[in-house]
């Protein structure tokens, strides 16, 4: 879906953490 795009929060992505907005 277009609403489910992996975005980088604060420009950094913690290991094993995938932010889906």
Swiss-Prot record:
Region (Disordered): 1-21
Molecular function in Gene Ontology: toxin activity
Keywords for this protein: G-protein coupled receptor impairing toxin, Mast cell degranulation, Secreted, Toxin
Any one cellular-component term (Gene Ontology): extracellular region
Disulfide bridges in this chain: none
Primary location class: secreted
Tissue: Expressed by the venom gland.
Locations listed in the record: Secreted
Compositional bias segments (type: Basic residues): 1-11
Family assignment from sequence similarity: Belongs to the bradykinin-related peptide family.
Organism name: Protopolybia exigua
Function: Causes constriction of the isolated rat ileum muscles (is 13-fold less potent than bradykinin (BK)), as well as degranulation of mast cells (is 7-fold more potent than BK). In vivo, causes algesic effects. Muscle constriction and algesic effects are partially mediated by bradykinin receptors B2 (BDKRB2).
Coiled coil spans: none
Protein name in UniProt: Protopolybiakinin-1
Source organism, top-level taxon: Eukaryota
